[in-house]
UniProtKB/Swiss-Prot annotation:
InterPro entries: Poxvirus_F5/I6_dom, Poxvirus_I6_C. GO terms for cellular component: virion component. It is found in: Virion. Its main location: virion. This is Telomere-binding protein I6 homolog. It comes from Fowlpox virus (strain NVSL) (FPV).
Amino acid sequence: MDNFLKQISSNVKKPIAELEDPDAVIKFHYMNISFNFPDLYYCNNNLFDKPENNLLDISKSLLMLNSFSHECFILQDILRVIRRYGHVYDVYFLPIGWLVGHGEAPKYHASIKLIRSNTQEIIDGIIRRQLSQYGIQGDNLSIFVDSSNEVAINRHSIIGARQLNPICVVSFYPFDPEHKVFFVIYVGRYKDKYCGISYVADREDMYKVINRIYPYVSCFYLVSDGIINFHTTPVANHTRNIKPLPVNYCNTLCEIVYDFEYLKFEQGVMSIPVFMPFVPKQFVSIINLPDDILITCTASSNIEYITHIDNKKLKRILIIIKDKFLKGTIMQGTFKKVNIIRHKKYTYTITYSSFDCPKLEDTKSSLPSTCNKAILDGRRYVTKTFNDTI
């Protein structure tokens, strides 16, 4: 989580107020929940390489996760449970490595690293019961608390503190990006560490939360997902009287995240530009798109993606996986396609496009029984998975 904070705050002018010595030290321990998915068969040995983990890398990892819908559902379910009892540090999944940071790869398909206090031992049994619903138990599950490695986090009192000039960074929340928004309020620093308080809120309440934080900060920094990049927009508070934060304490900024406290923050009013902290995405092959339906796509920086199908805006944009047939085509505009069996292969052809692209002259489809199959079992029943004809 430390790396994610650095990434979203890289273009931010942080407050320089030096805080008083901490009045308390909160102590936690790291806890690792590692497990295998019993029915997942996947290997990326000698291929996987992620030398860094910037915002585009994290976005790509979240895109990859959507290709593993069952495993992603289980991870999201466990993360929702964990947030009631601890603070998530990072998430590992074999196809993407660590989601927001770096570290040694565990010998399991997935791992969740969190911090918890010594009074939260109940989480062990809760996680075991939750994962057992998905058949994850026994040798497929390991829960380890590193009692030898204590995490000490400073707590600073800001009651009556003067000359504070807090700012707030708003971005997607990496452990639930489609439903949660992340708010990091920077208050000041203590020695070489920045201090503040971090909140999450439902995405649908994002503008309500911004309006409530506005009277207490000098500037918002809105981190927006531009699909091919991320950019940060500063929105200054031009009022002269910034209210003191309605909290008594802040802490060293880290993975400690709280649900937003609506009752503490008074309602404010500000003009907020429309922005998207995160744009949900998933991969798609042309062959899996509906036939004879108008499809709208756009292109930017060698990435082509679909925004509308049948003139209806999609909740997720679809990143097109192009094959050799469309290798030299820039897909920007509208098109229609139809799937056919040609030369014993299940393929597709473009029947209409507003942009230049190759089209097959003969669009007549052969009988399904003539199609080459990945599995030849002698049966007449023919269909396809996402990738193979069977």
